[in-house]
C-alpha cells in the first residue's frame, strides 16, 4: 500500500532498528550472563548453564510456531481492514498458548531430573547435574512469561507500539543481569543457590515484562481485543500450519552443528574446533543487522501480501536490498578489520589456534551480507505464506548447503576450506533459489518470479499515488473520477469516489501534516473489486481514528465535520485501522 519509496524506507528502517536493538540486548544479556557465571561460579556451573540453553530451545520450539503463525494471520487480517478477524486470531492464539504454557511449566518441574540426563548431565559429575537441575528449577518459573514475551512482542510491534517492545526487551535484559549479580554476591559461598538465583532472575524477568506487554492490548486504540466467544479451532490450525517452518528451523539448527563439527574435528582437530567456538561466541552480535532487516521485511510483506499490493512488495524488496548493501557490508568490513583483536580476546596471539581463528572470522565476515539476503528471502516466503518453499529454503540454508560446503571444501583445502565454506554456502543458496525461481517463472517479470507471486496476484485495475500538498489531492481526485468512469463505474459513484479522496486525503494534508514538524506522506490506492470502488488512504501522521471522530460528530450539530459526515454518508463501508504506526482508512463505494 505504501506507494512512496520514502514511506516504505521509513517503515522498514524504523522496524529494522527496533529488531536490531532487541537482538543486541538479547545477545549482550547472554554474554554478560556467561561472564558473571564463569568469573564467580567456575567452569562446571558455567557448563551447567550452557546445557540449560537446550531447555530454552525446547520451550522456544513450542511457542515459536505460534508466534510466527499468529503474527502472520493477524497482520493479514489487519491488512484488509478486518479487525474482528484479527481479534479472533488473537483470542484463539492467546488462549491456546496460555494452556500450552501452563502444561509446559508443570511438565518441566515434574521432569527436571530426566531433562538433566537428556541434556547431558547424567549424574557422573554431581556438581554439573545439580547445577543444571537448580538452574532449570529457577528459570522454569518464567516459562509463562517467556511464552508471552515471544508471542506478544511481534503483535505489540504490529499494533504500532514498537517503543514498548524495545523498552521491555532492554528491561528484561537489565533485570536478568541485576538478578545475576545479586545471586552471585548474596550466595557467594553457595554455588548451587547462586545458580538457582541466576535461573530464577531470568525467568521472573520474563514474567514481569510480559505483564506490561499484555497491558498494551487494554489501550483503546489497540487493534486486538480478547473475547472468549471468538475462539476458533480453525484459526488455531491455520496458525500452526503457517508457523511449522519454525519447527524445521529448530531441527536444522540442531542437525547442522552436529554434522559440521564432525567434519571440522576430522579435518582440523581441536585447533579448528577452538576457532569455531570463538566464531560462535561473536556471531550473534554481527547477525543482528541482517536479522533485524529480515524481521522488518517479514512484517511488511505479511501486510502487503494480504492487501494484494504487488508493487509495495517489490518496493520492500528493493529497500531491503539497498539496506543490506549499505549496513551489512559495512558491518562485514568492520568484522574483517577487528578479527585479530577479537581472536586475541579468546586466544594467545601467535598460536595456530589464533591464526586459524583470524582466518575463520574474516571469511565469516564475507558471509554476513549474503546471510542477510538469505534471511530476507526466507522472510518474504514466510510473509507471503509460501509454506513448502519456506521449509525447503530453511533446510537448504541452515543445514544442507553449509554441511556440504564444509565437507567438500574441508576435504579439499583443509582448515582454509572450512573457513571459505561460510560465504560459499550462503552464495550457493542464493544462486540455487534464484535459478529455480526464474526458471519456474520464465516469461514473467523478474521481481514477480523471484518473490514467487501467483500469476493473478494483485488488482488488474488500480491506481496508486503519493500526495504531500492539497493541490496534488485535488488533481488526483479528478483523475480518480476519470479512472472510475472509464472502467464502467456509473457517474454518481465515480463522483462520490473522487469526493471521498478529496475529503479524507485533504484532511490529512491540511491538518495531519501540521500536527508536528516532521515530514509526512499520504498514500492513496484505488482498486476495482466485485463492482465496487475500494480506496485505501494511509498516512504516517499522529494517531487519528476517523471512525471515532465521526461518532463524536454525530452527537453534535449538523454543521460539525461536514467532510467526515459526507464520507460516511457516501460510503458503502468504511473501516479504520491503526497499523505499523500509520493511520489506514479503507472505503468501499
Each PLM stretch: what is its role?
Residues 46-106, 149-165, 275-333, 373-393:
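Small-residue-rich hydrophobic transmembrane alpha-helices
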Residues 481-502, 556-557:
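Conserved short strand/loop->alpha-helix "switch" segment adjacent to the catalytic nucleotide/phosphoryl-transfer site
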Residues 28-47, 116-126, 182-193, 254-281, ...:
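Helix-terminus/linker motif at the lipid-water interface of multi-pass membrane proteins
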Residues 449-463, 569-589:
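Flexible, glycine-/charge-rich segments associated with ATP-binding catalytic modules
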Residues 26, 67-68, 138-158, 165-176, ...:
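Short runs within selected transmembrane alpha-helices of multi-pass transporters and secretion channels
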Residues 534-561:
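Glycine-rich/acidic phosphate-handling loop/turn and adjacent ATP-lid/helix
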Residues 14-33, 138, 149, 172, ...:
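Transmembrane helical elements of multi-pass membrane transporters/channels
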Residues 1-19, 74-142, 186, 191-243, ...:
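Short alpha-helical transmembrane segments in multi-pass integral membrane proteins
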Amino acid at each position: 500500500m505504501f506507494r512512496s519509496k520514502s514511506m516504505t524506507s521509513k517503515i522498514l528502517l524504523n522496524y529494522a532498528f527496533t529488531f536490531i536493538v532487541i537482538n543486541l540486548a538479547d545477545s549482550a544479556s547472554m554474554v554478560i550472563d556467561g561472564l558473571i557465571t564463569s568469573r564467580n561460579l567456575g567452569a562446571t556451573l558455567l557448563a551447567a548453564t550452557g546445557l540449560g540453553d537446550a531447555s530454552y530451545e525446547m520451550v522456544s520450539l513450542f511457542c515459536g510456531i505460534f508466534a510466527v503463525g499468529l503474527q502472520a494471520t493477524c497482520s493479514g487480517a489487519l491488512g484488509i481492514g478486518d479487525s474482528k478477524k484479527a481479534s479472533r486470531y488473537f483470542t484463539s492464539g492467546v488462549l491456546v498458548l496460555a494452556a500450552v504454557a501452563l502444561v509446559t511449566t508443570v511438565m518441566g518441574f515434574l521432569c527436571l531430573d530426566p531433562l538433566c540426563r537428556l541434556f547431558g548431565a547424567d549424574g557422573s559429575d554431581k556438581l554439573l547435574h545439580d547445577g543444571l537441575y537448580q538452574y532449570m528449577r529457577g528459570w522454569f518459573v518464567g516459562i509463562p512469561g517467556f511464552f508471552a514475551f515471544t508471542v506478544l512482542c511481534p503483535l505489540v510491534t504490529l499494533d504500532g507500539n514498537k517503543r514498548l517492545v524495545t523498552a521491555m526487551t532492554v528491561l528484561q535484559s537489565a533485570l536478568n543481569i541485576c538478578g545475576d549479580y545479586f545471586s552471585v554476591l548474596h550466595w557467594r559461598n553457595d554455588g548451587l543457590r547462586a545458580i538457582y538465583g541466576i535461573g530464577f532472575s531470568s525467568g521472573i524477568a520474563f514474567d514481569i515484562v510480559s505483564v506490561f506487554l499484555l497491558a498494551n492490548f487494554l489501550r483503546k486504540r489497540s487493534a486486538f481485543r480478547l473475547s472468549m466467544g471468538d475462539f476458533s479451532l480453525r484459526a488455531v490450525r491455520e496458525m500452526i500450519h503457517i508457523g511449522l517452518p519454525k519447527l524445521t528451523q529448530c531441527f536444522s539448527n540442531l542437525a547442522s552443528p552436529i554434522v559440521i563439527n564432525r567434519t571440522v574435528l576430522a579435518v582440523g582437530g581441536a585447533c579448528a574446533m577452538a576457532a569455531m567456538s570463538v566464531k560462535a561466541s561473536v556471531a550473534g552480535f554481527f547477525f543482528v543487522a541482517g536479522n533485524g532487516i529480515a524481521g522488518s521485511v517479514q512484517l511488511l510483506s505479511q501486510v502487503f501480501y494480504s492487501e494484494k499490493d504487488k508493487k509495495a512488495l517489490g518496493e520492500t524488496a528493493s529497500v531491503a536490498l539497498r539496506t543490506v548493501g549499505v549496513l551489512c557490508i559495512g558491518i562485514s568490513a568492520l568484522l574483517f578489520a577487528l578479527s585479530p583483536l577479537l581472536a586475541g580476546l579468546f586466544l594467545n596471539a601467535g598460536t595456530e589456534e589464533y591464526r586459524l581463528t583470524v582466518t575463520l572470522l574474516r571469511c565469516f565476515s564475507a558471509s554476513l551480507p549474503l546471510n542477510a539476503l538469505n534471511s530476507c528471502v526466507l522472510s518474504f516466503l514466510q510473509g507471503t505464506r509460501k509454506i513448502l518453499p519456506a521449509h525447503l529454503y530453511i533446510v537448504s540454508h541452515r543445514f544442507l548447503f553449509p554441511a556440504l560446503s564444509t565437507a567438500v571444501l574441508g576435504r579439499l583445502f583443509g582448515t582454509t576450506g572450512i573457513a571459505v565454506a561460510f560465504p560459499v554456502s550462503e552464495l550457493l543458496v542464493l544462486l540455487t533459489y534464484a535459478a529455480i525461481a526464474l526458471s519456474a517463472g520464465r516469461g514473467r517479470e523478474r521481481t514477480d518470479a523471484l518473490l514467487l507471486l501467483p500469476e493473478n496476484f494483485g488488482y488488474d485495475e488500480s491506481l496508486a499515488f503519493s500526495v504531500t500538498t492539497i493541490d496534488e489531492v485535488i488533481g488526483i481526485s479528478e483523475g480518480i473520477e476519470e479512472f472510475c468512469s472509464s472502467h464502467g463505474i456509473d457517474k454518481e459513484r465515480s463522483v462520490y469516489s473522487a469526493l471521498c479522496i478529496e475529503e479524507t486525503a485533504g484532511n490529512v494534508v491540511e491538518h495531519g501534516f501540521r500536527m508536528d514538524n516532521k515530514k509526512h506522506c499520504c498514500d492513496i490506492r484505488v482498486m476495482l473489486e466485485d463492482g465496487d470502488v475500494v480506496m485505501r488512504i494511509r498516512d504516517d501522521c499522529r494517531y487519528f481514528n476517523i471512525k471515532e471522530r465521526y461518532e463524536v460528530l454525530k452527537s453534535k450539530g449538523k454543521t460539525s465535520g461536514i467532510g467526515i459526515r459526507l464520507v460516511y454518508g457516501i460510503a458503502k463501508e468504511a473501516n479504520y485501522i491503526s497499523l505499523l504506526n500509520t493511520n489506514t482508512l479503507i472505503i468501499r463505494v
